[in-house]
C-alpha cells in the first residue's frame, strides 16, 4: 500500500513471516530486505538458527560479521542515507531481535550496567545491557535521519511485540502475566511516536493495536483502504484530537507455542471488559479491567460476557485455520 502512495519500502532486521517463496520480504511488498528471515537467533554473533543461516541481502544468503543489533543499526543507517538520494519518500520497517533470548549483550555494554548496579543478578544485568545496547542503536538511527536532513519529515514509531519475559527477569510492573500470556503482562505494551515539529510531547492511555498502525499510515499519506482490515486510523489521536479507540472488539490469538498442543490462546476486549483463555486447557476468565487491572478477580457471567464470547467465536470463524509453512530439512 505504501508503494501505491509512491514510497520506496524496506525492511531491516527480523522477518519471521516465512523462510521460502512466496513468503519472502521481496515478495510481500518490500523493495529492499537486509536482515534475518527467521524468528530468534541461537547466537547474536553467529546469527544461526538451528544450524541454518537465514541472513539475507534481498534473496542472497550472506554471512556478515558482528553483533546482530549493531548490524541492523548500521544497515538501517546506510539505507536512510541511500534513500535520501532517491526522488521518492521511504517507508522503513526496522525490526531488532533484541532483547529476545539468548541474552548476549556486547561485553562492554554489560560492564557498564554492572558498574552502575554491582548487585544486579547475572540474568537481569544481561537483559538490561541488551536493551540499552538496542536503545543506543535506535539513537544512532535517529542521528542518521538528522544528519541526512530527513528527521523533520519522518514519523518514528517504536513499540514492542509483547510484554517482558520473566525467565529473562523482565519487569512488567503491577500487571499480571508475561510474554506468552493473554493477561495484560503478555499483550499490553507501550508505544512511542516521534515526529519533530508535528507531535506534542504528551502521554495518552487509549487502547490501540498493532493493526492500527497500517490504517493510520494510510490515512497520513491520504491513501484509501478499500478492503476489510482489523485496525482503525488513530491519526486524530496523533493530532491531539479526542478519539474513542476502545468502542470495538479487540482480539489477541496465539497459535504457535509448543506447550499448547496446536491449540490456541485467546483474548477479546471491549471497553473495560476482557474475556480470555490463557491456556487452551484452562477455563475462560472474565474481568473488568478498570476495577481489576491486575486480573485477579474473575467476574461471573453476564450479558457482556455473552457478547464477548460470541465475538470470540465469530473471530474464530472469520479467521479460520492458518496453514503452517513447510519445514526446511537440513
Show the residue positions of the predicted features:
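Formylglycine-dependent sulfatase
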Residues: 1-285, 289, 293-330
